[in-house]
Amino acid sequence: MSKLCIGIICGGRSLEHEISLKSAMCIAQFIDKFRFEAMILWIDKKGCWHLKDIDFNDLSYHKDEKISILLQNCPYPFKFHTKNINILLKFDVIFPVVHGTLGEDGALQGLLCMMNLPFVGSNVLSSSVGMDKDVSKCLLRDAGLSVVPFRTVLAQDQHNIDFDYFVSIFGLPLFVKPSNQGSSIGVSKVTKCKDFNLALIKAFSFSNKILIEPAIIGRELECAVLGNDNPKISVCGEVILSDNNFYTYHDKYVKRKAQIMIPALINDAISDDIRHIALRAFQVLNCSGMARVDVFLNLDNKIFINEVNTLPGFTFDSMYPKLWEVSGLNLQELITKLVELALDLHDKKNCFYHVDGAVLKYFRHERI
């Protein structure tokens, strides 16, 4: 039986470039090499694509083949092409781990759809919606799910933002965050007016749309979702910060200050509620493949959705694979399952595509 060729796309021009490289290295190390042949498609910070062998230690090392995506005279015309060796690369499945802008916001997913390539994760719309906290929270709220209260502010209105107004409706502390960044990039905790103005400048430097939210006093819990039509839900995990602050980019990937508790020490009723909410959120946003749903549990045991991450971190320390490991699915099995889900979803999507003018023929027939 021939192996499937898996293209792991990583890097990119977003602020989460380095996290993406770590995710790719983790997948490359643990992918089932008896079933799959994997190659790395690395996008550097300038947006250039490179082909790398799976046996690597440092993705920043530049011994590689630059590649282009060219139009060819074939039924599905997009192919990966290397400049130095005259071959066309054919991938059976793409595993994208380009976190952040242009990677999990639907841009890369749209390219892969145009290339008719099966890929791991959610489609264009779900990826785009999941990346935009404003839009995703509106959809979740309209579906009857509790989200962290928020107000959205556009860049053109930033000079009319009144600190006292937000304190009157939300109290202190406040959180100010870009609408479309991940890994807590650009997020600030605010306790006074001077900090508020600096937080606005910081958030607007990452996005032209920001969210202002109250602090939810309580616990930060996370749940992993895996599947397409009948998704499975992992056990709940908890992020515990010793200084009672918030889970910053620095805490996640530099200092690694947070303690991760899996499973979370919560009673069965609350655990079941969180898992049900995670499932509903996944379905409301029409996600597929995988997602991580982050919630807050306040002091009254009320659950608020913080965000739905459609392309969660896949590093050795990331919560998503850890949650599944405790739930009985090791990293190799998880990667294999995600590839299988990608192939299954692609087969179903192709049923909706029409070729040879089938739709026009139908309408011509109707008019006769």
Swiss-Prot record:
Cofactor(s) needed by this chain: Mg(2+); Mn(2+)
Residues that, per the record, bind ATP: 167-222
EC number(s) on file: 6.3.2.4
Co-factor binding comment: Binds 2 magnesium or manganese ions per subunit.
Name this polypeptide is given: D-alanine--D-alanine ligase
Residue ranges occupied by any ATP-grasp domain in the UniProt entry: 137-340
The keyword Repeat belongs to this UniProt entry's keyword annotation: no
Protein origin, superkingdom: Bacteria
GO molecular function: ATP binding; D-alanine-D-alanine ligase activity; metal ion binding
Lineage: Bacteria, Pseudomonadati, Pseudomonadota, Gammaproteobacteria, Enterobacterales
